[in-house]
Amino acid sequence: MTRNIAEEIKRLKEEKNAVLLAHYYVRPEVQEIADYIGDSFYLSKLAVGLEAQTIVMCGVSFMGESVKILNPEKTVLLPDASADCAMAHMASVETIEQMRKTWDDLAVVCYINSTAELKRHSDVCVTSANAVKIVKALPNKNIFFIPDRNLA
């Protein structure tokens, strides 16, 4: 990224009352101009307390969705709409519906790295740091962990 582009981005952030969040996995030159850098959960939580009216989320699509869910009144931009995470699509709404028909007393536990659509059809959303604690506290006898059973 050239110095001129970085300066223009800084100018636009100030002009538009915007903040730039960058995930650890984005290119270093993007991280250099970011206001905050972190993992998806940290950035989502951080966004709630920001005064900026526009949040630019430099990461994959589920990260932008998570920020928007927590900040419905703000404009959330995703610079690369094609940026995606394969894990976010490893489960489907149809699979959730089928599991609910098959198992009584089912709790659908969704990992944060999932699409907003999957989160909407889940009972609870967890991170790797709190998944065990939350699942142990659930009263349900049947747990369906999505999107990837290896995370469970």
Each language-model region and where it sits:
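Active-site loop-to-helix "anion-binding N-cap" substructures in soluble metabolic enzymes
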Residues: 1-152
